[in-house]
From Swiss-Prot:
It comes from the Eukaryota. The keyword Signal does not apply. Signal peptide: none annotated. This is Phytanoyl-CoA dioxygenase domain-containing protein 1. Transmembrane segments: none annotated.
Length: 291
């Protein structure tokens, strides 16, 4: 299951994404959910750091790029919240566990449960079957997609945020911790859209200038009829090419759509852009996947 067949590899190269149902067991998914429950129960976020996560461009710049809480989260475990969950003083308007959009961006490095999933033999075998020589883990996120108001993620390419030279060196690994359905906000892809380069980049502003990030280029209008929904069952793994266009809709159902996702970069012969918002640090250089 972890080693891709020639036909699976061909489909991934053709479409820019690939679904592998049953990659993780129900027990592994439960272990992640239980651990996240413990992390959330211990959550202590200062008022000035209660950053609402948004996927619309201007709101991204205001809510993320202008705050050091986001820009310095690459080597930490931090909390990002849905829109409208705080009053004007930063107090929760909904139960805290229902307010979180995601936790990022270093669960893979600092938490034993997520570290073991990320570096599992299955994941390493999968990476080897993709031909990755020296993959490193650049970031990880636990995404909640809360019931009733889990925010939409507008069409984008991961390489807009995680840019490399040459392109084609970033791979998203998206694991369904719960069933992802049409109703609760499954992923949608434009098959084959990974072959046209990157139309937009989010770059970190020079030190001392504001805001913290800005966008170069713009996201072109996408033909909605080209998007294909990708509902999957709990335990499925979705491989996501760094340049494939994908999105997810708002979750208006009464069930969450939790997922654990991390990004790999082929480090051999690759330059990680110094303009990316996310940078390796002395405390956490990008860890090697193969252990």
């Amino acid at each position: 299951m972890a080693c891709l067949s020639p036909s699976q590899l061909q489909k991934f190269q053709q479409d820019g994404f690939l679904v592998l149902e049953g990659f993780l067991s129900a027990e592994e998914c439960v272990a992640m959910q239980q651990r996240i429950g413990e992390i959330v129960a211990e959550m202590d976020v200062p008022l000035h750091c209660r950053t609402e996560f948004s996927t619309q461009e201007e709101e991204q710049l205001r809510a993320q790029g202008s705050t050091d809480y986001f820009l310095s989260s690459g080597d930490k475990i931090r909390f990002f919240f849905e829109k409208g969950v705080f009053d004007e003083k930063g107090n929760f308007l909904v139960p805290p566990e229902k307010s979180i959009n995601k936790i990022g961006h270093a669960l893979h490095a600092h938490d034993p449960v997520f570290k073991s999933i990320t570096h599992s033999f299955k994941v390493q075998t999968l990476a080897r079957s993709l031909g990755l020589q020296m993959p490193v883990v650049v970031q990880s996120m636990y995404i909640f997609k809360q019931p009733h108001f889990g925010g939409e993620v507008s069409p984008h390419q991961d390489a807009s945020f995680l840019y490399t030279e040459p392109l084609g060196r970033v791979l998203g690994v998206w694991i369904a911790v719960e069933d992802a359905t049409l109703e609760n906000g499954c992923l949608w892809f434009i098959p084959g859209s990974h072959t046209s380069g990157v139309s937009r980049r989010m770059v970190r502003a020079p030190v001392g200038s504001a805001p913290g990030t800005s966008f170069l280029g713009s996201e072109p209008a996408r033909d909605n009829s080209l998007f294909v929904p990708t509902p999957v069952q709990r335990g499925a793994l979705v491989l996501i090419h760094g340049e494939v266009v994908h999105k997810s809709k708002q979750n208006l159902s009464d069930r969450s759509r939790q997922a654990y996702t991390f990004h790999l970069m082929e480090a051999s012969g690759t330059t990680w852009s110094p303009e990316n918002w996310l940078q390796p640090t002395a405390e956490l250089p990008f860890p090697q996947l193969y252990t």
